[in-house]
């Protein structure tokens, strides 16, 4: 009986620990470094495209500002790989100490690189127009101003 209670306690602790881990984790490397936890959403506001957003949960020490990424995703949403060529308008940006800004964007043109891999994408039964997604997001941000060198990689697992 005692061993059953110990096993039950160990399983309960493992489940509690697993739930405490954020489902979305990100990392910056290159000219700006750091790690962050985040939330990922993929919603369809009713205009013919979905919106993918990586929303950080807090600041990164020594990083003045960062927005890991928000891009439009073509419908229908499904598992697969999307690059900046496939995605709609959007932006990822990281500001470095000293004023340098690194971006990957798609507006009328493109800069930087973005790869979004959706391993799983299924409608969220609790929220109309939303999907539950799992996968990876990677963006290579390049300097926005003249005279700056290097790049920043944003890597997110969700």
Question: Language-model features: where?
Answer:
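Hydrophobic h-region of N-terminal signal peptides that target proteins for export
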Residues: 5-18
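Acidic, glycine-rich flexible loop segments
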Residues: 86-158
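A broad, structure-centric signal for solvent-exposed, well-ordered loop/edge residues
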Residues: 7-8, 35, 125
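An ectodomain-focused feature that recognizes extracytoplasmic/extracellular
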Residues: 20-113
């Amino acid at each position: 009986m005692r061993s059953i209670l110990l096993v039950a306690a160990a399983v309960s602790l493992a489940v509690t620990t697993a739930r405490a881990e954020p489902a979305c984790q990100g990392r910056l490397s290159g000219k700006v470094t750091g790690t962050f936890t985040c939330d990922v959403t993929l919603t369809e506001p009713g205009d013919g495209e979905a919106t993918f957003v990586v929303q950080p949960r807090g600041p990164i020490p020594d990083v003045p500002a960062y927005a890991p990424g928000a891009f439009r995703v073509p419908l229908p949403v499904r598992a697969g790989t999307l690059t900046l060529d496939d995605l709609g308008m959007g932006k990822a940006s990281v500001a470095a100490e000293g004023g340098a800004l690194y971006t990957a964007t798609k507006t009328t043109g493109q800069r930087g690189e973005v790869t979004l891999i959706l391993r799983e994408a299924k409608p969220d039964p609790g929220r109309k127009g939303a999907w539950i997604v799992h996968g990876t997001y990677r963006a290579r941000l390049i300097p926005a101003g003249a005279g700056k060198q290097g790049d920043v990689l944003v890597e997110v697992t969700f």
